[in-house]
Each structure stands twice: as structure tokens, then as C-alpha cells.
């Protein structure tokens, strides 16, 4: 539930559910989930990157928690087949929340420092009749290294390879 705090992103200034929070990257929603779920134990359970939350929960996106693209893919594959033993309906809900188009799933992430987008992620998977293709793209720079830019690059690569047929 939104606590009334005014954020610079209008979509954040309302109650959220998983789908709306995923679509609008509502950080406060996920920070609340992290607090409620005991995120440190959870990260250890799924072996997520270096599992280091010493930088705090509100700044973990650009802080001490680090993960490589290969580790992201390993985590995503394990999630996809539910190696972690989550409730099936929860796995399904997350997959539905990150579905971009039929058979194409992904989530962006952007790390900002002093208002500059310095770390962009786009991770996900694409399904066809015979295969599942997992991907994780990370771009870094002094500015304009956003999740949306990472998504543009990933879509171009996946399209060029004939894995997806997607137009934004």
C-alpha cells in the first residue's frame, strides 16, 4: 500500500500490485517486499550474486550487492524451472508480470548515481515451440546507461538472431 510519499515518478504515487510495480519499476514496492520477506536469507537461498546487502535495503540497486550477467542467467534459469521450490502460482505471477509479448519476457533495471544513469540491465527469456533462450544484458557508463537502453540493444540482438519478432 502506498504510504502517501510523493515521488517524482507519477506512477509510483498510488497503491501497487506486482504487475503495476514491475511495469513501472516501483522501487518502494520492492523495498517493502524486501523488508517483509527477509531478503538477506532469500538471496542466500537462491545464491544471488555476492549476497551482500551491507549497503542497505534502500540502495541495493547501486550498492554492495553485485551480480554478473552469467549469474543473472543462472538465477533466471533456476527460477524458470522452479528449482527454488516456490509456489507454482507465485512463479506464474512473476512470469506474467514480466511478459512483454507472446513468448517474450523481460525486466529492465537502472542504477543511478547523482541523477546519472550509470548501470542498465535487461534480463529475461524468450520461448518458442522448441527452445527457451535466456539473456542478461548489462551496460555501464557515465550517463544514459539505462535499462531501457539495455532493452533496445537486447531486442536488436534477439531479433537479428531470429529468436524474437518484436517491435516496440
Residue ranges and their predicted role:
Residues 1-2, 60, 121, 125:
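Tryptophan-centric aromatic hotspots in well-structured domains and transmembrane helices
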Residues 4-13, 17-18, 30-81:
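Mid-domain, small-residue-enriched loop/turn segments at the edges of structured enzyme/sensor domains
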Residues 1, 21, 135:
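Active-site SXXK
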Residues 21, 43, 94-98:
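A generic structural signal for nonpolar/aromatic side chains embedded in well-ordered alpha-helices
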Residues 7, 35, 77-168:
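Structured C-terminal helix/loop/strand segments within mature extracytoplasmic catalytic/sensor domains
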Residues 25:
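Acidic/His-rich structured neighborhood in mature extracellular/periplasmic domains
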Amino acid at each position: 500500500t502506498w504510504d502517501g510519499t510523493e515521488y517524482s515518478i507519477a506512477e509510483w504515487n498510488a497503491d501497487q500490485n506486482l504487475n503495476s510495480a514491475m511495469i513501472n519499476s516501483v522501487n518502494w514496492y520492492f523495498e517493502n517486499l524486501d523488508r517483509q520477506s527477509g531478503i538477506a536469507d532469500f538471496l542466500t537461498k537462491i545464491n544471488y550474486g555476492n549476497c551482500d546487502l551491507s549497503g542497505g535495503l534502500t540502495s541495493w540497486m547501486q550498492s554492495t550487492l553485485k551480480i554478473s550477467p552469467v549469474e543473472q542467467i543462472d538465477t533466471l534459469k533456476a527460477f524458470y524451472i522452479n528449482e527454488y521450490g516456490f509456489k507454482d502460482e507465485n512463479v506464474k505471477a512473476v512470469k506474467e508480470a514480466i511478459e512483454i509479448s507472446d513468448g517474450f519476457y523481460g525486466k529492465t533495471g537502472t542504477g543511478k548515481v547523482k541523477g546519472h544513469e550509470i548501470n542498465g540491465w535487461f534480463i529475461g527469456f524468450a520461448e518458442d515451440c522448441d527452445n527457451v533462450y535466456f539473456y542478461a544484458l548489462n551496460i555501464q557508463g557515465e550517463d544514459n546507461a539505462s535499462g531501457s537502453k539495455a532493452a533496445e540493444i537486447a531486442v536488436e540482438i534477439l531479433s537479428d538472431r531470429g529468436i524474437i519478432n518484436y517491435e516496440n
